[in-house]
């Protein structure tokens, strides 16, 4: 029997589905852009969605690390979507917050507003922090990554090699 497959994450987290159904496969279109010739299995899987006019880059990783990576990349005409705890780092940029790091319900409520608000702005690029994939984070991250056309920078620290 083929396990169930999550095509588009939403308000019911993957963990809740798995608690009832057992293992649930996550379709690759949830985490990456479909290649030319690949057919989407559900509406909204293939194309950029909810994308502002300015190009978006999503920075993944621990919140502190992703904030530092954004700080390293931003310029005076950049926009930033970040967690509330890091908004003060970006005093020279236009900033819209997702909410507190630990409150994915608030982040889910604010993600589209943060993206859309930049359409009335003169920013030339947007950098966005991304929550981890636990709980609603999978859906929030999916929406941010789709808006970015899956232009994602891994802000995770490289592993240390022990000799």
Q: Where are the regions that the model predicts?
A:
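Active-site-adjacent structural elements in enzyme catalytic cores
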Residues: 1-163
């Amino acid at each position: 029997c083929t396990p169930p497959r999550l095509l588009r994450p939403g308000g019911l987290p993957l963990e809740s589905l798995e608690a009832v159904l057992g293992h649930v496969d996550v379709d690759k279109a949830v985490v990456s852009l479909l290649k030319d010739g690949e057919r989407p299995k559900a509406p909204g899987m293939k194309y950029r969605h909810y994308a502002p006019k300015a190009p978006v880059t999503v920075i993944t990783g621990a919140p502190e690390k992703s904030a530092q990576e954004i700080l390293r990349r931003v310029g005076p005409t950049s926009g930033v979507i970040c967690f509330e705890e890091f908004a003060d780092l970006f005093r020279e940029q236009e900033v819209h917050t997702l909410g507190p790091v630990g409150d994915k319900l608030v982040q889910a409520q604010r993600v589209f507003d943060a993206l859309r608000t930049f359409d009335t702005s003169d920013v030339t690029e947007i950098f966005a922090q991304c929550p981890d994939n636990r709980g609603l984070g999978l859906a929030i991250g999916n929406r941010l990554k789709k808006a970015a056309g899956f232009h994602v920078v891994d802000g995770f620290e490289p592993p240390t090699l022990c000799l």
